[in-house]
Amino acid sequence: PEPTKENLTQLQEVIRREKCDFGIAFDGDADRIVFLDENGKFLRGDTVLFLLTKYLKPKKVVYEVSFPPIFSQFLKKFKAEGIESKVGRVFIIDCMRENFADIGGEISSHFYFRKTNFMEDAFFTFFQFLKILKENREKVSELAKEYPILPSESFKISVKDGEKYTIVE
């Protein structure tokens, strides 16, 4: 199953029962990774991109328009230029290339790095996350607590193909 918040209850139970430092889950083709803290709390993609930005210190970061507005304020705090993009892989990658960005991310936990030629690579993201944990020696919840979790839900609305553009306008 997809590594969504709803599908991770077993992993959350294991993290709590075994007192794990954190948990991870990949999607089927390993281009997406989700993280859970030591309490089994799900970290959204914006929280993970916040951590990657804070500790890896990229100069330019591309993020989706669906990120909470506070995200751009943190980028300024970390002296990173934030570039907002349309939602979706193609838009993020194109925006990263056009702006020579170092890192990009989606709420859905797809992350992109210039170092990997903009490929979605969950394993590269995982190793960057491990590097952050090793260098900071703090619990994941401690590292993430500075970034406030604002209520945000996404939902799908079914519309006929011929009506989508009219509705968006």
Where are these regions (language model features)?
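Short, acidic/small-residue loops that bind anionic groups at enzyme active sites
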Residues: 41-60, 86-87
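Alpha-helix N-cap and loop-to-helix initiation/capping positions
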Residues: 2-6, 41-44, 121
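Phosphate-binding and adjacent anionic-ligand microenvironments
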Residues: 58-169
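N-terminal small/polar loop signature for handling phosphorylated ligands or for N-terminal nucleophile
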Residues: 1-36
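Short, well-ordered alpha-helical scaffold segments within catalytic/effector domains
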Residues: 5-12, 46-50, 168
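Generic hydrophobic alpha-helical segments
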Residues: 7-15, 53, 92, 96
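Generic detector of well-ordered alpha-helical packing
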Residues: 26-32, 38, 65, 107, ...
